[in-house]
Amino acid sequence: MKFGYKFSNLLGTVYNKGNILFTPDGNTVISPVGNRLTVFDLVNHTSITLPIQSKYNIRRLALSPNGQILITSDESGHTLIINLTRQVVLGEYKFFKTPKSILFSPNGAIIAIAVLEKVFLFKTPIIQKQPNPLIRLSVFTHKSAVISMCWSADSLKLMIGCKNGTLLIRQGKSERVSYFQVKGSGIINCFFGNEESTIAYAVTPTGLASWDYKTNEEMEQEKLERVENGETAYLREEEMDEEKLKVITENQRLYKGRWIFKGFKKFENYGVKCKVKTVCFHLKSKLLLVGFSTGQFILYEMPGFNQLYKLNISSHGISTSAINNTGEWLAFGCSELGQLLVWEWRSETYILKQQGHSYNMNTVAYSPDGQTIATGGEDGKVKIWNTTSGYCYITFTEHEGPVTAVKYSPVSSQNVVFSAGVDGTIRAFDLVRYRNFRTFVSPNKTQFSCLAVDPSGEIIAAGSLDSFEIYVWSVRTGRLTDILSGHQSPVCELAFDPINPFLASASWDKSCKIWNIFEDREIRESIQHTSDVLTCAYSQDGKKFIVSCLDGTIQIYETSTWGQIGLIDGKNDIMGGRGYKDEILAKNNSAGRAFTKIAFTPNGECIIAGGNSKYICIYHIDQQVLIKKYSTSSNLSLDGITLDINWKRVGEFGHLDAMEKDFDSDDDLYQQNKEYLTGSSKGDLSKRTTKKKQKTTSISVSPTGRAWAVSTTEGLLIYSLDDFLFFDPTDLSIDINPDSILSELNLKNYLKSLIMSIKLNEKPIIEKVFESIPFNEIQLVCQEFPIYYLKNFIQFLSGYFEKNHHLEFQMKWVKLISIYHGKYIKTNSLSMITSLRNLQKTITQTYNDISKVCDDNIFSMEYFKTVLLKELKSQEETNKISKKSQKYKKYLESKKNKEQEEDQFSDDEETVYQNNKKNKNK
């Protein structure tokens, strides 16, 4: 089994606190999720969490105009400079407090960062790592804390809004500053109203104040017109008092003109229970978006302050808002509900509507095909998440109490998920019709703590917290078939044997019992332990059974003889950090040093275990050793992350994290926690400041074995062997043009030239590079091809197939792309379904055309072959006959010659004989 699991995605949490951003193209939203960042692609409907963690919860975000540099700052002022394209940290910077505002200039050359009363100007870093990423240019100090800033369109002016109602406009390198004072109220945000920067807006909790910049010539002209009309030339102070707002401009005569107060307009729904929470302004479309604490937002058209749209989108206050580059999409974040919305106000439709669990997530389960994940939380909701897109596409709210367990039916064709809750019900949900089609209840009202489904999906069992019994139901009939009694403490875990008809139950009474619920309904085996049993699990083949105990041990049993074959002591591996309320060191604290959740890998060789700490451990069963250890979080905003506490934060009256704060600047800028004041009649007097502790509440392994998920305090973490983190491997600092592409091609950098051509998106260039890649280099290019451009490349292949007929060359590409990236193509088939269908259609059509010609050619070749064979055969026979005849002729000739020779020889002998006879006679 491979152990190269890496963090892949974070589900279950879409927004915590801080501001949200649109990317420059307007199609992507960046949302802070704890100490991580989640990017939502609104066009492809996918979300991915960047593999970057800050030290504390992120509170401020800023993105450069070109979308390459992202700056984040957390609660402690720790600032990260991130290359968003490559998803790497370029550098770090430490401020003494969390910045209230971080803003890039429109030309992208300068960064303005406001920290308390100071405004720092830095030079924008390059997209490469360097020792000092932020070079400070200048710093300005003010009398009050800076709340907001705004750059002019030409990047020469910087507007600064302070907490005491002071508004300043700094111009370029000069020391000239324009001052405005809004008495009686603070400033929430400030903006320039036009591209010429001659209109200034300041948003207060009650309304909107505006100023116009008038040149000396314009003021003289207006003065003459007013004198001719019998009007005064200047606005009197009494007129401002009527608006209950006094605005004081500088008395000095400015260069070429001065700022003139135009008026103050109140928000129509302002009241005691309705406070302004967030404001943003879109310069191109002149839209002002105001979000209120009631969950309502109003869209105004400026400069006329005309109300265009009004809608209530949430039951809680809107924490942050943003407008995309076209002004059509409005993004909202609600920290109390963990909700993220994107609304298209012209068509009145949701582009994105995601919400995590309001409270902690208790349980998680993978579907049989590994495509979806079911989660249950303390808020009584069951959510179904798509592992590919990272979106929640259905939420079931039928439970009236916290959900303690969720399980999928092992039969994938049933499309059923079961859930158990403390409300005393077991509910079955249909994932096709999205409804609760069956509810199982016990005779006596009880709280269910665990759930198990048999391999056939026909029987479910649930364990009780208060009655210590196990209830068994038939899914088909919905009737209670049996009640199993025998435990003396709450039942904490149930597990069905995948092969044999047995049910295992674990309880706090230090026992683990094996039930035969299908035959005699009696206890087949009872395993006693020396400490409380926390959880148990079967392997996929049913041959091994593991039990986790309170003493930190994991005991391994063989199911054939139920003999113990191994013991893993993991209390030192699961040891977490020290909490701010702990009086002893973490290594001396025995509390929580046990595995509360364990799961087998699909091959049954390893187990994945977690507990009340930030660590996840993977053990090998046979060797009983720790193979790998994962840390689920490094967020110091959570408790129990470090091995020891920070003694600088411990005072005479305890730890600073446990003390109440009269003013929380991150939650509400202008509202103190008055419920803690002496004589206050409202508020919960039992409230305390607490920190969440990082722990693992559930573990589930994908049936494919390539991923596993854990539900933690921060959300649902997915660790995978597949690299789904998209990044652009092309160095964006290089000028991508046809000449640079051809030069890379001449240098035989085939992969880089192909990616650059796809990025340039000019078909002739892509075709030239594509056809220039040698046949023997295709495999290497396909193997290293980034999935970031896979969709565009498949689209190119589908179009290239229709026009060109380099069949073997094209099929080589298709084959190798499918081999090396088939997993990703399968899981993301919906996003590229059009290109895949076009490619399939073209290949099928080519196959049909070629196959018909090939079949005809094959038949013709068979005919010619047959004729040729016959001809050859007849020719061979003829040759054989001719050879025989020739041999016979030769034989006859040789015989004739022989006879002639014999005749001649006989004549000669006769002559000799006669001569001899004559001689003898003589």
From Swiss-Prot:
Record-level GO cellular component terms: cytosol; nucleolus; Pwp2p-containing subcomplex of 90S preribosome; small-subunit processome
Gene Ontology biological process terms, A to Z: maturation of SSU-rRNA from tricistronic rRNA transcript (SSU-rRNA, 5.8S rRNA, LSU-rRNA); ribosomal small subunit assembly; ribosomal small subunit biogenesis; rRNA processing
InterPro entries, A to Z: PWP2, Quinoprotein_ADH-like_sf, SSU_processome_Utp12, WD40/YVTN_repeat-like_dom_sf, WD40_repeat_CS, WD40_repeat_dom_sf, WD40_rpt
Disordered as annotated region, ranges: 893-922
Keywords: Nucleus, Repeat, WD repeat
Similarity comment text for this entry: Belongs to the WD repeat PWP2 family.
Name of the protein in its database record: Periodic tryptophan protein 2 homolog
Name of the gene: pwp2
